[in-house]
From Swiss-Prot:
Keywords: Riboflavin biosynthesis, Transferase. 5-amino-6-(D-ribitylamino)uracil binds at residues 31, 65-67, 89-91, 122. It comes from Phocaeicola vulgatus (strain ATCC 8482 / DSM 1447 / JCM 5826 / CCUG 4940 / NBRC 14291 / NCTC 11154). The gene is ribH. It catalyses: (2S)-2-hydroxy-3-oxobutyl phosphate + 5-amino-6-(D-ribitylamino)uracil = 6,7-dimethyl-8-(1-D-ribityl)lumazine + phosphate + 2 H2O + H(+). One of its GO terms (molecular function) is 6,7-dimethyl-8-ribityllumazine synthase activity. Disulfide bonds: none annotated. The active site is at 97 (proton donor). Pathway: Cofactor biosynthesis; riboflavin biosynthesis; riboflavin from 2-hydroxy-3-oxobutyl phosphate and 5-amino-6-(D-ribitylamino)uracil: step 1/2. This is 6,7-dimethyl-8-ribityllumazine synthase. GO terms for biological process: riboflavin biosynthetic process. (2S)-2-hydroxy-3-oxobutyl phosphate binds at residues 94-95, 136.
Length: 168
């Protein structure tokens, strides 16, 4: 989706379907909340801009990014959502912890997508510096939360269109 120095909030508003009848779950990491907070705000704002109702947006927090997979799985099992947006931020440090958390979270979310009927949108920012994270959480490169919300809407629209398609 995003490329180097691409503004994550730039998109054609009219290309995004109406989300009025869609239900969204957002699982957000408490760790690095100075980043995940603005990402969450961006996602919610964008969902609402495209017709999502407050009552159809369920937000739950988890302690860290590694827990996003479990939180997303539980949200899916609840039956209360049509799509899940997983939001987190991991900034590289001096130990291999960054690599383990990023790989585990990425693999977990990929597995949920491969095995399930509910799209789980990957909103994990993985950066080398806090400045890079800030740039992607409402800074000079836009807000990845916007991008995640749009992706969730488009994936639900994709799923709905596919279910209605008849091939003979």
């Amino acid at each position: 989706m995003a490329t180097a120095y691409h503004n994550l909030s730039d998109y054609d508003f009219n290309s995004v379907p109406n989300a009025e009848n869609m239900r969204f779950g957002i699982v957000v990491s408490e760790w690095n909340n100075n980043i995940t907070g603005p990402l969450l705000e961006g996602a919610i704002s964008t969902l609402k801009k495209h017709g999502a109702k407050d009552k159809n947006i369920l937000v739950q927090t988890v302690p860290g990014s590694f827990e996003l997979t479990f939180g997303s799985a539980q949200m899916i099992k609840s039956g209360k959502v049509d799509a899940v947006i997983a939001i987190g931020c991991v900034v590289r440090g001096d130990t291999p912890h960054f690599d383990y958390v990023c790989a585990g979270t990425t693999q977990g979310i990929a597995q949920l997508n491969a095995e399930g009927d509910i799209p789980v949108i990957y909103g994990l920012i993985t950066t080398n510096t806090m400045q890079q994270a800030e740039d992607r959480a409402g800074g000079r490169l836009g807000n990845k939360g916007d991008e995640c919300a749009i992706t969730a809407i488009k994936m639900l629209d994709f799923k709905e269109k596919l279910q209605k398609t008849q091939i003979f």
